[in-house]
Amino acid sequence: YKRQDQSGIVIKQLFVIEPNRTDEALKDYAEETFEINMKVAESLSGTITPQGFFAVIEKPKYDVTQAKQVLLIDRIQDPGNLGTLIRTSDAAGIDLIVMEKGTADPYQDKVLRASQGSVFHIPVITADLKTFIADFNGPVYGTALENAQPYKEIASQDIFALLLGNEGEGCL
């Protein structure tokens, strides 16, 4: 919840198993707090041992016009892969992640767990990649075998986009 405060996420509803054992600061961030039982928590979490609290958040709105270092994701299917890409992008200082329609939902539970909260630190949007690339003011690098060049041989850029393709089909 400390990250929530820094990221500006608005918690609309908070669901907790034991409200009396939940930190008051966390409850203060939520517009509404509800008590749920363990059976409901297990159903919501999809895991054997739920964490004890769940939140409904307002989907963030981002100003993406100033993004200089962008990860473009072309239909990544596996939620664990997407979460890992989000977490790695956050650690690497990427400004924006743009996903093509057909990419896994960044707010799905498995993606959220794999991203370790990074989905709330970095703007993640869905857009038509061809349109985004046409409007982007910088080089776009892709992952492909044809005419491949080692990344260490490419001059460093302040503004760039990196395109990663689908697990089975690559970049379209």
Where do the language-model regions lie?
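Short, hydrophobic beta-strand segments that form beta-sheet elements in well-ordered domains
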Residues: K12-E18, T33-E35, V56-I57, V124-I125, ...
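Ordered, amphipathic secondary-structure segments that act as subunit-interaction surfaces
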Residues: G46-V56
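Short, polar loop motifs at secondary-structure junctions
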Residues: I17-T22, K59-P60, L129-K130, L145-N147, ...
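Short loop/helix-cap segments at secondary-structure boundaries that form the rim of catalytic
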Residues: D23-Y29, Y62-Q66, A134-D135, I154, ...
